[in-house]
């Protein structure tokens, strides 16, 4: 068994809570948890505790929720914990150098991609969007840059043709905790090896936007299909028809030459709605019309065949 470390954990969403759960079941001592202050959530905009806070309180772990680390009080509070290490997973706050230097062994971060390929806010989504064949998690020693620190461990897995950001998120939420525990064992035993990132291979994974998720039918069908998977569960790829915004949950690419204007429906039946694109054909298989749940195209056509007649144009 490796040496037990005194760990401060910093994280906020469910992805982070799954890592905290693994730490709470390990030989390491979780001496405190940092998470973002309550934010209004849901339709009622009620102040809701983060999944990390909820889990920490269930295990009687002290919780700290500073707005930032600018005050002397917040810095002194962290220093007083006398931590060996801070583990950061999707915390959502920038950590200044004074915080990074406070724990004896510094701060490490679990990042949801293979660095340095995708640094930044949306690495899971961008790996699918770009057509990458694999992704994973990188555990790195944090520095003042954005995901630029030396890498301590990389764990990879393939991106399947059917993977969405939602399914990939779940896979990485299983892979990450396992990689984290292995990395902590190396750190505790003094055998961890830090590898510098090649900045020349780095890309920035920009945040997604609703505007970006609107389908451009002039793009190639392969790119549109990747966007549909990358933007699920948010912001959801969509198009306009009959002044209604239609969300696309599932589609496939059919390789064939097209002469029609991109966005033109060239076939619509129970096998799908076939739409001309800038290259090849995109076959829509599952859609969501306003006020309804996602349905197979066959059901959509039974209800709204008038919206999807052959020759009509999607925008």
Curated annotation (Swiss-Prot):
(6S)-5,6,7,8-tetrahydrofolate binds at residues 113-116. Keywords: Protein biosynthesis, Transferase. The keyword Transferase applies. The keyword Transferase applies. It catalyses: L-methionyl-tRNA(fMet) + (6R)-10-formyltetrahydrofolate = N-formyl-L-methionyl-tRNA(fMet) + (6S)-5,6,7,8-tetrahydrofolate + H(+). InterPro entries: Fmt, Formyl_trans_C, Formyl_trans_C_sf, Formyl_transf_N, Formyl_transf_N_sf, Formyl_transferase-like_C_sf, GART_AS, Met-tRNA-FMT_C. One of its GO terms (cellular component) is cytosol. GO terms for molecular function: methionyl-tRNA formyltransferase activity. GO terms for biological process: conversion of methionyl-tRNA to N-formyl-methionyl-tRNA. Its EC number is 2.1.2.9. Belongs to the Fmt family. Attaches a formyl group to the free amino group of methionyl-tRNA(fMet). The formyl group appears to play a dual role in the initiator identity of N-formylmethionyl-tRNA by promoting its recognition by IF2 and preventing the misappropriation of this tRNA by the elongation apparatus. This is Methionyl-tRNA formyltransferase. The gene is fmt.
